[in-house]
Amino acid sequence: MKSLNSKTFLSVLFLCISISITAQNTKFKVVLDAGHGGKDIGATYHGYAEKKIALNTVLKVGKILESEHDIEVVYTRNKDVFVELDDRANIANKSKANIFVSMHCNANANTSAAGNETYVMGITRNASNLEVAKKENSVVTLEDNYEIKYEGFDPNSPESVIGISILQEEYRELSVELAAKVQQAFTKKTTFRNRGVKEAGFLVLRKITMP
């Protein structure tokens, strides 16, 4: 498991949103979503927990972003608490933000899996992408009445994962464009292996009304 340097992530984020900021008079609003939290630990590796790394990175990045007069930051969580996936989407939508960025850190004993990648909501039948989505979506089983709330969604079903991807099609083009810029910036500013832009069906994105 490897955490991102907050300054590196900040510079990448600035590079990706600078054009949008200059094109509007109001503040550019960024939702920072620290993945997992509370009873949902996320990935673990040699004592490190994804939920803590994601939160620490998001808080550091958010603090620096907040020092800029033309950027407003909204957090889905700013402490170690469990936030349901739909609630994360509701926070983002109510804020009427420009972009939604969810921070996650994977862990794998296979060192060839190292690097950074950016996911957007999309229809895919790629086995590895589906497995990533299934792993992240499995958090819904920690929520009460998730079968009703998510309308019969089965986190272990490829058909369910593919089905929810259709709901985000409106923002797909902008999401892919932003994701490509993120990957390009990481390639220029870090030595991380570029694992590219990928698509999969993530429940946290299904109701998001922004890239």
Predicted regions and their residues:
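Bacterial N-terminal signal peptides that target proteins for export
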Residues: 1-10
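N-terminal signal peptide c-region/cleavage motif recognized by signal peptidases
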Residues: 18-20
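Catalytic-core regions of hydrolytic enzymes
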Residues: 24-153, 168-180
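Active-site-adjacent mobile loop/cap segments within catalytic or ligand-binding domains
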Residues: 31, 42, 106, 160-211
